[in-house]
Amino acid sequence: LALYFAGIMMVLLSTVTNLSNVSRLFQVLLPFSFNFLDQTLNLFVGFLLLGLARGISMKVKKAYWPTIILLGFCIVNTVARTTSWQLIAVYAVILLAVILARKEFYREKFVYSWGALTVDSILFGCLFIGYAVAGYYAARPAGGNQVINHFLLFPSDDVWFNGLIGLSISLIGLFFLYQYLAETTVTLGEGFEEARLTRFLEKFGGNEGSQFLYLKDYGHFYYQEEGEDQVLFGFQMKFNKCFVLADPIGQREKWTAATLAFMDQADLLGYQLVFYRISEEYVMNLHDCGFEFMKVGEEGLIQFEIGRAHV
């Protein structure tokens, strides 16, 4: 939350440069926010803080050191321009909190969820719209409408244009930051290996969804013991969700251990497992593993009687 606050404050104060002069709330909050002399640097650092806050909230290991370095840079820059021991104490607490939480960061990569993507899209979309509106009124003052002028006008068109450049650079930097956080050599499960899959199905048999596992857009997670494949899951990836098709294939007595191993590996990479088209027996197994479940649709069986055709 502290990182989100710092990032949003820096972006807001750089986007609407006189915001602290027209709002008592921001007059109170301004002394507790990072602030640089350069508007472009304010925007750039603000967006990086927002991006790292997202990574920290998802407990991504690779977000830890960039956050420490960026916070240290912000603190040194700000403290060099202030003598407020109260402010220094607040910054020290924020930095200490991140350091003490370092063991909480265990995920190998950053993966966007639908919810996080929606929130960030709304945040950045509102920022762009607000900046465009501010630029419009900066170029065409709103006549006698002192309220609009008071809130949205920049000191000059140059200030607005410099901010626009900073905004563009910041979004590019944010894109590369997300790319960095999302890169990893660790993968979930295995790719399509026809010989291995066929050998496994011949040994343990299949289920109602096993024919789909030969489609190359499915991934395969093999649970092994002593180097031998024991249980198989077939899945597809959608954002941060891993949709697992039907019951596991393999030794039933090892389903629970295999499911827990699959959960741990998926969580390590930032994915959440979603099971569908599964049996009642496996539903209870998943419930014991901590999953919630809901029933959608019904399964029906029809017996067709063979007889003379009717015209």
Language-model-detected regions and their locations in the chain:
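Topology signature of small-to-medium multi-pass alpha-helical membrane proteins
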Residues: 1-190
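Exposed alpha-helical structural elements
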Residues: 10, 196-199, 281
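Short secondary-structure junctions and interdomain/linker hinges
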Residues: 12-18, 184, 204-211, 269, ...
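Surface-exposed charged/polar residues within alpha-helices that form helix-capping/stabilizing sites
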Residues: 54-55, 210, 264
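N-terminal topogenic membrane-targeting module
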Residues: 147-148, 154-160, 180-243
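Charged, low-complexity surface segments at secondary-structure and domain boundaries
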Residues: 182-188, 300-307
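Conserved donor-binding loop and adjoining core beta-sheet/short helix segment
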Residues: 213-306
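Conserved small/polar residues in nucleotide/adenosyl-binding loops
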Residues: 309-311
